[in-house]
From Swiss-Prot:
Membership in a protein family: Belongs to the vanadium-dependent haloperoxidase family.
Protein name, UniProt field: Vanadium-dependent bromoperoxidase
Organism per entry: Corallina officinalis (Coral seaweed)
Keyword annotations: Metal-binding, Oxidoreductase, Peroxidase, Vanadium
Lineage, broadest ranks: Eukaryota, Rhodophyta, Florideophyceae, Corallinophycidae, Corallinales
Keyword Metal-binding applies: yes
């Protein structure tokens, strides 16, 4: 028996009205203006022949640069800005990309023997027009904003770049061994250097911008070194449980799980996650220890000129659970967008972590005669945790390309290195970083030793001094501006969905860490309490800071982008709530420590 036509029309009208209501809700949120920090205009110099470089703190990667790392022609950058703001494919295709080409071979003419010997091609800017795209759910990409990025001469920027150099110098340190005697010299050096900087040793002042106040970090200790500041990130082991543990497998009720656990593991399923009837491992490929990139000025300049070194990193045989700073940097090099959060969701579901008690149909089936799946169940959260990712990416792409256009840390390291070498000759090429060079003197000396060792290993028996920021990736940063971070905005959005669905206050009964010697999990000596929300927040910080550890993002990129992603996810949850017939709310603990109901 069919459904009467009148009922179908009524349903169609109700469906239309629901969509209109969602659109009206999105419109009612309003638009938050996006403001840059003013440096693009401050360092604009249309006449480079007078000796002042142009756009030195803007993202110019891909355009031709001079021997100091400044763009040769400011008009190239202005054309770049016009093209990305228009989104016109032809305008983008007509931009100057990379160096001059050899008239005979047609290949780019690189500065370094390495790039020329590999016959490298150029790489293009990544999705520069994505922020111009419209979406059909959640906040419009251009309706939410990030605050202005820290300026080049600020105490915050000096602290950020100091932290990145220190992370780079400690890439072989194990997360579980920060307090080990064997690492004491490096760890104490890092702590002392950071605590000696104004950003860490001076409290926020009345009248400071709110965004700066919320990013402000106090005294650095062994317990919070290189950690995030989201609620839970400073509690327990450095690594979130959800990036190292596994889950119960199918057949676990009859002992089927045991076949997947290594004989020497402390258990928690040995880092193996049930993905349906197959398993996926939390283990990561082992990047060659001590192998850093872009430590030579000519190679660095080639990368700024668009040399495509992707794929030229090297690895040890096998894989292991994340153990070192370099391991985490490797994890975030090739992760599949929402991988960490889908994995976390699979772990939470397989281990029967309860949903938020406010979500419908949480009683025993014998009481409400229903189980959850399409709505408020496994299928719902598995779909939604991935669905928010590209919406968040569009929002951050708009901030990256169309608003802030912040230079990557590798380029800041270039300014510092060039100026440090000039200072030793009594000169100053980029006086804007004179203070940074002075305050980072001890860190830069260690960086020079590390870079010299790397450059000798790369075949230069007598390398020139280099104070560049060592990169974990052969290609350096991705081909888009630094502020904000794609990894961080996705982290913020996906973790927000997970916290909305699962019982955030649920306590984790056993805490694990990765063994310092063997590829296995061991029970942690931590005696405090970890919660689902805290470990999900820590997961977001781990992934976002992993990009900092690789040398491709700053702390402010990571922190502000997580908050941006949260806004996207909240908007989607609000709009989708209009589609449900059940009367309920999501209870969401936000990244600022407050709790809201959706």
């Amino acid at each position: 028996m069919g459904i009467p036509a009148d009922n179908l029309q009524s349903r169609a009208k109700a469906s239309f009205d629901t969509r209109v209501s969602a659109a009206e809700l999105a419109l009612a949120r309003g638009v938050v203006p996006s403001l840059a920090n003013g440096e693009e205009l401050l360092y604009r110099n249309p006449d480079p022949e007078n000796g002042d470089p142009s756009f030195i703190v803007s993202f110019t990667k891909g355009l031709p640069h001079d021997d100091n790392g400044a763009i040769i022609d400011p008009d190239d950058f202005l054309a770049f800005v016009r093209a990305i703001n228009s989104g016109d494919e032809k305008e983008i295709a007509d931009l100057t990309l990379g160096p001059a080409r050899d008239p005979d071979t047609g290949l780019p003419i690189w500065r370094s023997d390495l790039a020329n010997s590999l016959e490298l091609e150029v790489r293009g800017w990544e999705n520069s027009s994505a922020g111009l795209t419209f979406d059909l759910e959640g906040p419009d990409a251009q309706s939410i904003a990030m605050p202005p990025a820290p300026v080049l001469t600020s105490p915050e920027l000096i602290a950020e770049i100091a932290e990145l150099y220190l992370m780079a110098l400690g890439r072989e340190i194990e997360f579980s061994e920060f307090d080990s005697p064997k690492n004491a010299e490096y760890i104490q050096f890092a702590i002392d250097q950071l605590n000696g900087l104004e950003w860490f040793n001076t409290p926020a002042m009345l009248g400071d911008p709110p965004a700066e106040i919320r990013r402000r970090r106090g005294e650095v200790t062994v317990g919070n070194l290189f950690r995030g500041i989201l609620p839970g990130s400073e509690v327990g082991p450095y690594l979130s449980q959800y990036i190292i543990v596994g889950s119960k497998q199918i057949g676990s009720a009859t002992g089927g799980n045991k076949t997947l656990v290594s004989p020497n593991a402390a258990d928690e399923f040995d880092g193996e996650i049930a993905y349906g009837s197959i398993t996926i491992s939390q283990r990561v490929r082992i990047a060659t220890p001590g192998r850093d990139f872009m430590t030579d000025l000519k190679v660095f300049l080639d990368v700024q000129d668009a040399a495509d070194f992707r794929g030229f990193e090297s690895y040890e045989p096998g894989a292991r659970l994340i153990r070192t700073i370099r391991d985490l940097a490797t994890w975030v090099h090739f992760d599949a967008l929402y991988e960490a959060y889908l994995n976390a969701c699979l772990i939470l579901l397989a281990n029967r972590v309860p949903f938020d008690p406010n979500i419908p149909f949480q009683q025993e089936d014998k009481l409400d005669n229903q189980d959850v799946f399409v709505n408020f169940g496994d299928a719902h959260v598995l779909s939604l945790v991935t669905e928010v990712a590209t919406r968040a990416l569009k929002a951050v792409r708009y901030q990256k390309f169309n608003i802030h256009r912040r230079l990557r840390p590798e380029a800041t390291g270039g300014l510092i290195s060039v100026n440090k070498i000039a200072a030793e000759k009594g000169e100053s090429v980029f006086p804007e970083v004179d203070l940074a060079v002075e305050e980072l003197e001890d860190i830069l000396e260690k960086a020079e030793i590390s870079n010299r060792k790397q450059n000798i290993a790369d075949g230069d028996p007598d390398p020139d001094p280099s104070f560049l920021l060592p990169q974990a990736f052969a290609e350096g940063s991705p081909f888009h501006p630094s502020y904000g971070s794609g990894h961080a905005v996705v982290a913020g959005a996906c973790v927000t969905i997970l916290k909305a669905f699962f019982d955030s206050n649920f306590q984790i009964d056993q805490v694990f860490e990765v063994d310092k010697d063997e590829d296995k999990l061991v029970k942690s000596s931590f005696k405090g309490t970890l919660t689902v929300a805290g470990e999900l927040n820590k997961l977001a910080d781990n992934i976002a800071i992993g990009r900092n550890m690789a040398g491709v993002h700053y702390f402010s990129d990571q922190f502000e982008s997580i908050l941006l992603g949260e806004q996207v996810a909240i908007g989607i949850l609000e709009e989708q709530s209009l589609t449900y017939g059940e009367n309920f709310f999501f209870n969401l603990p936000k990244f600022d420590g407050t709790t809201i109901q959706i």
